[in-house]
A protein has these predicted regions:
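Mid-domain beta-loop-alpha active-site segment that forms a flexible
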Residues: 4-25, 68-70, 145-152, 197-204, ...
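Helical element adjacent to the flavin cofactor pocket in flavoenzyme catalytic cores
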Residues: 5-62, 70
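C-terminal catalytic lobe of FAD-dependent flavoproteins
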Residues: 15, 154-235
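Active-site catalytic microenvironments for nucleophilic, acid-base chemistry
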Residues: 25, 29, 77, 215-219
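Short strand-coil-strand connectors
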Residues: 52-54, 95, 108
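Central helical "cap/lid" subdomain
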Residues: 57-102, 223
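Active-site lid/adjacent beta-loop-alpha segment flanking the redox-cofactor pocket in flavoenzymes
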Residues: 98-190
Length: 235
């Protein structure tokens, strides 16, 4: 080991609980959420925009593009090509064990993220690739990636040698060519705002949303986001 860092206030959250909690809070503030509602087209409409969706057309004066790996597809509807890609990766969960790891373990050199959930199951990841399937939004588990990921995890936490796996699931994460977020108003498309954070969307989502809300409301964002404008990709 060449070096390490310890962050005593490093946090972790269960997205299966955190995401519905955010949605419930938004509804209490007046938001209307349309689940499983795909945007199939987006175009200027008078002084605003019109989105064609599975629930019918929706008109809005302002649009926030926070579609993750699909953000590039949405921006392309407005004639703006952004280097946003979806990458299939996978995560493994084990049976419950005694408490061993109280914090998030991040092993950059070995491609490993590892933590224990509240019920003491281990969650093992690290960006290992899943397989692409016929449906781009439905990746499949890659057995070789699973074995390689577990090899690193067992080296770092030997207790895993006697722990059974329960399941493995793949998903799509979003990335940009320069690994930087895309935030702020889309150049040449007034009223359209980007809120896209690559690779760590769940972690950075709340702050990205806060900064985006400030910009949408015409306020100066509390952090300077000029370097993250989509203008860096546009001629």
């Amino acid at each position: 080991m060449i070096g390490a860092a310890y962050c005593p206030d490093e946090g972790k959250a269960n997205p299966l609980k955190a995401t519905p909690a955010f949605a419930a809070a938004a509804r209490r503030l007046g938001a209307r959420i349309l689940a499983n509602c795909e945007v199939t087209a987006l175009s200027p409409d008078g002084g605003g925009y019109r989105a064609e969706t599975g629930a019918g057309p929706i008109r809005a004066a302002r649009v926030v593009n926070a579609a993750g790996a699909d953000a590039g597809r949405i921006s392309a509807m407005l004639g703006v090509d952004l280097p946003i890609e979806g990458h299939p990766i996978q995560v493994t969960v084990t049976e419950q064990a005694e408490p061993v790891v109280k914090h998030l373990v991040y092993f950059a050199g070995g491609k490993l993220t590892l933590k224990q959930a509240k019920n003491c199951s281990f969650l093992i990841g690290g960006g290992w690739s899943a397989r692409r399937s016929a449906r781009a939004d439905r990746p499949a588990v890659d057995p070789q990636s699973l074995l390689s990921n577990l090899r690193v995890a067992r080296h770092v936490v030997p207790r895993l040698n006697s722990t059974c796996l329960l399941r493995v699931w793949p998903a799509i994460v979003n990335g940009t060519a320069d690994w930087k977020p895309i935030l702020g108003e889309l150049p040449g498309r007034p009223g359209v705002f980007m809120s896209m954070f690559p690779w760590m969307g769940f972690t950075a989502g709340p702050m990205s949303a806060l900064l985006t809300a400030e910009v949408v409301l015409g306020r100066k964002p509390r952090l300077d986001i000029a370097a993250f404008s989509a203008a860096r990709y546009m001629p």
